Amino acid sequence: MEEQKPKGSGMEKIATFIVDKRNLFFLLYAFALIFSIVATGWVKVENDITTYLPEDTETRQGLTVMNDNFVTYGTARVMVSNVTYETAENICSDLESIDGVTSVDFDDTTDHYKSASALFSVTFDGTTTDDISVHALHTIRDMLAGYDTYIDTEVGVDTSADLQSEMSVILVLAAIVIVLVLTLTSRSYAEVPVLIMTFGAAALLNMGTNFLCGTISFISNSVTVILQLALAIDYAIILCHRFSDEHETKDTREACIAALSKAIPEISSSSLTTISGLGALAFMHFGIGRDMATVLIKAILFSLLSVFTLMPGLLMVFSKKIDATRHKNLIPKITFLGKFDVATRFIVPPIFAVVVVVTAVLANKCPYCYSYTDLVTAKQSESQIAHQKIKNTFGVNNMVAVIVPTGDYDSERQLLKDLDSRAEVKSTQGLANIDAMDGYKLADALTPRQMSELAGLDYEVAEALYAAYAVDQNEYGKLISGLGDYKVPLFDMFMFLQREMKDGNITLDGDIQETLDDLFEQLNKAQLQLQSDKYSRLVVYLNLPEESDETMDFLDTMHALIAKYYSSDTYIVGNSTNVKDLSSSFGEDNLLISVLSALFVVIILLFTFKSAGLPVLLIVVIQGSIWINFSVPTIQHESLYFLGYLIVNSIQMGANIDYAIVISSHYSDLKKEMRPKEAIIAALNEAFPTIFTSGTILAVAGALIGVMTTNPVIAAIGTCLGRGTVISIVLVMAVLPQILLIGDTIVERTSFDVKVPVDLSRVNRTASGNMRVSGRVRGYVNGVIDAEIKGTLNGTLNASVTSGTTIEPTKPDFYLPESKEQAAAEWAENYTEGEEV
């Protein structure tokens, strides 16, 4: 045979470079993976979901002010059941004696003793992460080991570490399922390690580059690996199957090059819907969406990179093993389902329409919640069990902090009084209402005479102390007019006295000094928690749940009460205000994600199928699956954490739509060769292995996350994702085929095509003799052909065909005028490469 060597296309050149330079890529990946292993330790994880609230929300602003100005000591609610009150009193004394415990609140009221159960409110000497608090908590656990004890606290709780431990177990179980699924759907057992290594590299690269994002959320840190696997495993499978097909007629290298050059555009196109769905998350006002979109899209891109640059080399290395371990197709044909779909094509769509309308209404009434404190997960941690036990016995403990400008004790006192008078308030605490001694409060203003009587000082000593205070505050007028009526808040005077004693300006007798030292220690802790140079913090305990309409209304009432005394620079901070801020932005975020994810996908499908009708049909099916998915919580009367809806909505639209695309693509191709009814049956058989692989992995991953994690946010995402994927699979297999059959007319009438002029420069090869041809050929062939043909023939066919081959008249892509056909044929026959066209 004589043949001029062709010039490869741009994609073929890229594929050739990747395959031929595979050892270079292996080396680069080795360095990159080593770096990623090290860099995973650099990733900072944010466990506080309120960090991602918009900057203009009250909760976000209030938390910033509170964290910058106050210290919040660790606390614990310790419930001991089946004890007498006398035993409880002894336990209280033992708890107070523990090093690291500041105070223990316990009395005989029903707030602390009920139904033979005692509730101790413990305050520690340090914050929730300080060693002194953690050690004290361990001591409490050891001390109460013999009792029926429940401890609800955030002290020593590392949410990120606990979640990572749970996700590691989930990942192992998911990996086992994935290996089984890949084994069933693979064509060779040796393909499985290639797929696993490709994905493992992509996952590690993504984790190792998360530090570039600065700080990522605990949600992204925990679920990305599993979602990356479930969403991107298809890419590796596509290339693997392409290689298997090409390897039947080509040697390993040529097969790998051909497979990669064809797979790159196919896989890239497939990934666009997933990326667009995830991209919609980035437009959320709630910053967690941007965080997840960044990490997950990065994961998809690394998956593409690994499939395009690492997997070809692995296929070359494992090619002999792949050939040696080939097995028969283990996935059965589902012709029976296809026949069912054909038979019910006029029955199922109307039923589906009714179901969609009903579930859309139910989904719109889904009982969303914005606080996960009281959510019950399938698997519960010790802390969650304790929280529920204490809640069921003693009720809720809903605390909010009111932050106001400092310096006006009278306004603080009056505000606390107004709040205490409300039935919705259990108790309040602030410097203005903390008892000092002899009936005085810490913020009460005393004259020198009152101070001398209270502290047991000589009047002259008290007067001298007041004079020194007046000088320190630059209030010289008081010295001139006389100090008899000069009033100073008790707290301010004690803090001034402490400073003067530290500076050595004042010395006292030993007994008084020791008493004051103990007092100063308590006052210092009170100040750190309740007062700074700019703000005062008032603590309010509500008789209301964290999340209810009544609670939201009372927050408005609190704002009105605060406005009576302060005109600006005030904040209310707590789980309830967090709920209020999240719920106010949810409606807009929900609409934004639903519209954008659907819009992005429609645009991609529009140019993929070149039909305005088909994308609408596919979107209707997937949107229907979303509505059905989120109607379930309404039917079950179970609260759904709002993030579960927002995140799964975008993933379901971006990822599950691929199942519908696979069936539609096969159907569109096959109906050119056979009748629509036969085409849809064949399309289901061809698409089922892909849908089974991807769908099973995503559904199992979601289900495992939902039932095996104790974190309510992650569990909500997993449960909704697993359920939504199963629903999507059922609909695309048992509803979409009928819709495609009866919607053919709509698809055809709304189809369009981009007119591309005939590119005669493609007629640039001539060859004669025996030859093997692989790829698309357009032109004139004169000779005997022995091949599998799938395409359009414009001319005369005289050949033997195998059973099952269909030959039907069809409209060619373009026509040459009859007068031009012979001239074109003669020109092509005499054309030589390089000749000017």
What are these regions (language model features)?
Residues 1-47, 101, 128-371, 546, ...:
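Membrane-embedded transmembrane helical bundles of large multi-pass transporters/channels
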Residues 52-54, 58, 69-75, 83, ...:
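Juxtamembrane segments of multi-pass membrane proteins
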Residues 65, 387-391, 414-418, 522-528, ...:
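Generic recognition of flexible, low-complexity loop/linker segments
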Residues 43-57, 367-380, 498-513:
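Acidic/glycine-enriched edge-of-secondary-structure segments
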Residues 74-82, 92, 107-164, 398-406, ...:
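A short beta-strand structural signal in non-transmembrane regions
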Residues 393-397, 423, 519-520, 528-534, ...:
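A structural signal for short secondary-structure junctions
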Residues 2-4, 8-30, 37-41, 56, ...:
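Structural signature of multi-pass, alpha-helical inner-membrane proteins
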Residues 56-61, 68-69, 81-123, 158-161, ...:
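Extracytoplasmic
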